[in-house]
Amino acid sequence: MGAKTYEGGDHHEDATNVLSTKSNAVGGKPRGANMLEDGDGEFGSDDDDDGGDGQDSSLAMVNPDDAAKPKKKKRSKKKKNNKKKSGAGAQRQTSPPRVPLSQLFPDGKYPIGQMVEVQDENLRRTTDEEFRYLSRGTITDDEALNDYRKAAEVHRQVRRWIHETIQPGSSLTELAVGIEDGVRALLEHQGLEPGDSLKGGMGFPTGLALNNCAAHYTPNPGQKDIILKTDDVLKIDFGVHVNGWIVDSAFTVTFDPVYDNLVAAVKDATNTGLKCAGVDARVGEIGGFIQEAMESYEVEINGKVYPVKSIRSITGHDILRYRVHGGKQVPFVKSNDQTKMEEGEVFAIETFGSTGKGYLRDGPGVYGYSKEPHAGNVHLPLASARALLKTINQNFGTIPFCRRYLDRLGIEKYLLGMNSLISHGIVQMYPPLVDIAGSYTAQFEHTILINSSGNEIISRGDDY
């Protein structure tokens, strides 16, 4: 989930093998590959466990002369028992995902994300004093780390279902509800009782942004349902939290290969940002590497070539407990921002690319809301506002939510109270973010845990 706002730097192509994923299979044309094509790159004005088979390998060494002995029967029985034992608890996830993770991982230990060894010695802490100074935050806490990994596994399993089922003709409302129902089922927190959704659930409303809408769109009550088309570019951005530790990850879905270069550009840029992240890395420099990777691509649409531009008005961000947007930002363009990443911090490294202007403005409608973390005690004259604030505190805290979530709780006639909370600075409203009409935008995002001994891309999967 991007946070609302830079040229230069060297781009290192796949600096580590460990970061090579199947994302690189998407072909990309560097800038200039289509010099013989027409087009000026503008859309116009803004006026518009690998398990075995359960067989004991030692049986292959049994002497054939022993076949007639009574022992064979006993050994055969043992083999059968072993085979049965190996299948015990080997439950598989359903589609749609509804088997709780507590049943799939009865030991309560969840898969580790992709570990990335620090390559630059200047980013490695070498003294005990420095390590003690920087060893703070969340990732040194084993319980919190396991919560992160649990949330990441839920994210992977739910998006696996998305990849299996999404197709032209899909309803965005049904897709959003399916994602959120899957997250709640796997975490065993339906969020219908006060406080339950604060133990585990959605980290923010499911983002389903189409085409020139880059971010912050979700289907809400009263809106006409949108049906996915073959020529659409869909960004799917959703968060999962366990005890307030939020995993924020996003990807782009297309059905027409004409958009392959756009997808490749953004995927490359995100992986570049992940490679550059680390203790003492400066966010302005990371933005430069991201921009160089992103803007080395171009895409041809309907015979016209467009450069892929890094979007400037939205950024990656650090993540705090129960707060998907912390105080630090990671731009997608080079800047002079000398802010450093520090030991123990968690970041959402995301990038957005566009065939349009590369600058987003507020679109019509409302994506969602969140309570301001530093909102003070304010007298609210409206009883509806006071009641709504109580509901927000009990069910969401500072986690973003949307109108669908309020309707799901049975809350009615809350718009007047919501407007009061917004006007008093207690609640923030998020509109959709759009580039110029006719343009296309793409997004990829991962959550990374910053550690001097090596970062963990907690949300990495076999899909991206």
Curated annotation (Swiss-Prot):
PROSITE patterns cross-referenced by the UniProt entry: MAP_2
Binding site for a divalent metal cation 1: D237, D248, E445
GO BP of this protein: proteolysis
Compartment(s) where it occurs, according to its Swiss-Prot or TrEMBL record: Cytoplasm
UniProt name for this protein: Methionine aminopeptidase 2-2
Disulfide bond sites: none
Compositionally biased residues, Acidic residues: 37-53
Binding of a divalent metal cation 2, residues: D248, H317, E350, E445
